[in-house]
Amino acid sequence: MSMSVAGSMTMSTLPGVGSPLRLSPVTNLERMYALDEAWNARDWDTFDAYHEASDVVVYWPGREKTPTIGGPDHRAESVRFCAAFPDNRVKHPYDVLFGDGDYTAFVTTFTGTFTAPLELPDGTVVQPTGKSFEVIFSTIARWRDGKIVEEYLKYDNATFMQQIGLS
C-alpha cells in the first residue's frame, strides 16, 4: 500500500519503529487504512481483526453517552448500518491522516444512500427514505497490540439526519 502521508512521504517509505508490544503510529496508520478498506468491501472478518473483541468501546455519532462495547456488538451494529446504507463509503485517500503513539486520526468524506430499513440498537426499525448523505467524517482511535480498543466516530449527526430525511 502506498498513500500520501506527511507531504511527499508515502506509507511504504515511512519508518516503522516499535516493539512487538507497542506498535508504531505508522503501523497503526496502515491498519486504520486497511480497516476502512475492509469497511468499504464489507469484509467483516478483516474488520473484526482490527477491533479488540472483548473490550473495544466505540462511540457512534449521536450515541456518545451509550457506546457500543465489545467487538461482536460493534460488528453487528456496523452490519446493520451497511444493510440500510449498502452503498456507503469512506473516501480514500483520506483528506487528513495522522498518528501519535497509540492514537490515529483521520478526516475524510462519508457517503451513502438510505435504501433499506435500519434497525437501531434498541430494536426500533426506521424505514428507508431513499435519500443520500455526504458528511465530513473523522475517527480517532486508540490502539493496543494492533487492535482498536477505543474509537470515536464523528460526523455532524444533525446534518446526516436532515440529508437522509429524518429531521
Which ranges hold each PLM region?
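C-terminal and inter-domain tail/linker signature
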Residues: 2-167
